Amino acid sequence: MAVAKRAQGAQSKLTMAFETDFGVTPSTGGVVMPIISSSLKASQNLNDSNVIRGTRNPAAPSRGNIDASGSITPPVDVIGFGYWLKLAFGAPTSTAGAGSAHKHVFKIGPDMPSATFEQGYKDISTYQQFSGVRMNKMALNFGGDSELTATIDVMGCKETMAAVPFDTAPTQIAFTPFENLEATIKEGGVTVANILSLSLNIDFGLDGDSYAIGNKGFRTYIDTGIVGVSGTLKAFFQNMDLLNKAVNGTESSLELTLTKGDNSLVIKLPELIYERNSPGIDGPKGVNIEMPFKAYYGDDSEQSAVLFELTNTQASY
């Protein structure tokens, strides 16, 4: 008896294309995205029946609404990460620099784009397509010596299983990763070397509870909401400087820079307040302090609670 071929993760790929009209899959513009993993899928509950029929046997269940969502882990790289930033913030403001360099600035805007995602299992000619996809959350963690990645939570509208890809000639991008060891950080506008780690969480406030009658259980639309920006800074406990900012509610700022040759990624939090969180004595080793924070927009000239500046050789996104 012959054994059917099984899809292999190494042979699979994730292709993303931005939609001109929400939920409408384009036929061109696909970009093959480098990823570590993707749990994007559609799930549908079966609801138990409460019908009484004169027998102890259960009646057939009914099908519920369909949730297309999941978490994607991409590397933080020189070219590809710009597409994730575009999904989060929309098209950047791009300017040409010296030589072949281009600077792309991503900020919080009035709306978010949508995209079609395709998980292609080419060894079994099956293509799992999700339309009307928006980014729900982004999480980044800096510090340590592990591979630098992001966690991207997405929410979509419709899943379609196809035998051919929506774009037969997607763009293949060069993969050049940023690394933790290339990071520098400023706190309050001053470069510091006592910070162990920085976590950043961005919640885009999506409303996925939009199941209209007549759409076969799929979402009809995904509305955007107010963005939440928070995180935690972990530093050596050397003095009271950080803790005093939390105690007094003093506004501060953070700026993290990653470099790779002539390429760079700068993340700015122009306005933030630390949450009061005193250190403790956990043992005989050095004492650290963890400072949760919330970023916001008040009166900074950038007019964005968080912004990303990506410099690379790509002309536009």
Please report, for each region that a protein language model flagged, where it lies by residue.
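Signature of extracytoplasmic/envelope-associated structural regions
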Residues: 1-317
